[in-house]
């Protein structure tokens, strides 16, 4: 049986798609730049929507400037999205920076560094002599 999705989840998914389209095509503000909409959480009464976004920049000052620009543009974005969606109540948009992507990349780099260090230590302490298993097998064949 297929998993059922609640109405708020379906609206959140559609809102995410529409926001991505509007931010990519209709927003001309150079302060915002390239924005990725990662997730949208809509309140049960559809009055608020938390929009989780990421940017290419990792500098916290630039990220905060972009979030501020999105916050100022939120009523305009809300109007554009409302024209695309058929909802009685269009949620108020709250833009939030999603740092999970940056944190995930940082964690992945740390794991890679640890693996490389372990390989280097293993190669350092492993002798360069050939395995004794071949000579043992060879002796058994001679018997």
UniProtKB/Swiss-Prot annotation:
Region annotation (Disordered) ranges: 119-143
> Is RNA-binding included in the keywords of this UniProt record?
no
The protein's location, in the record's own words, is: Cytoplasm
Q: Which UniProt keywords apply?
A: Cytoplasm, Ribosome biogenesis
UniProt cross-references to SUPFAM superfamilies, sorted A to Z: Ribosome-binding factor A, RbfA
Its domain of life reads: Bacteria
Q: Which InterPro entries match?
A: KH_dom-like_a/b, RbfA, RbfA_dom_sf, Ribosome-bd_factorA_CS
Q: Name where it mostly resides.
A: cytoplasm
| A GO BP entry | maturation of SSU-rRNA
Q: Name one GO cellular component term.
A: cytosol
Compositional bias, Polar residues, is annotated for 122-133
- Say if the entry is tagged with keyword Nucleus: no
Q: Which GO terms describe its molecular function?
A: ribosomal small subunit binding
Pfam assignment, any one: RBFA
Q: Which family does it belong to?
A: Belongs to the RbfA family.
State whether it acts alone or in a complex, and with which partners, per the record: Monomer. Binds 30S ribosomal subunits, but not 50S ribosomal subunits or 70S ribosomes.
What does the protein in this record do? One of several proteins that assist in the late maturation steps of the functional core of the 30S ribosomal subunit. Associates with free 30S ribosomal subunits (but not with 30S subunits that are part of 70S ribosomes or polysomes). Required for efficient processing of 16S rRNA. May interact with the 5'-terminal helix region of 16S rRNA.
Q: Could you tell me which NCBIfam families the record lists for this protein?
A: rbfA (TIGR00082)
Q: What is this protein called?
A: Ribosome-binding factor A
Task: Report which gene this protein is encoded by.
Answer: rbfA
């Amino acid at each position: 049986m297929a998993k059922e999705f609640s109405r708020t989840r379906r609206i959140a998914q559609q809102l995410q798609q529409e926001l991505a389209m509007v931010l990519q095509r209709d927003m001309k503000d150079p302060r915002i730049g390239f924005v990725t909409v990662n997730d949208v959480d809509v309140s049960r009464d559809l009055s608020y929507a938390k929009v989780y976004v990421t940017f290419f920049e990792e500098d916290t000052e630039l990220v905060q400037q972009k979030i501020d620009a999105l916050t100022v543009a939120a009523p305009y974005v809300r109007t554009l999205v409302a024209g695309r969606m058929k909802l009685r109540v269009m949620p108020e948009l709250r833009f939030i920076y999603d740092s999970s992507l940056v944190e995930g990349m940082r964690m992945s780099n740390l794991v890679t560094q640890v693996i490389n260090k372990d390989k280097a230590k293993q190669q350092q302490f492993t002798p360069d002599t050939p395995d004794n298993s071949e000579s043992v097998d060879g002796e058994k064949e001679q018997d």
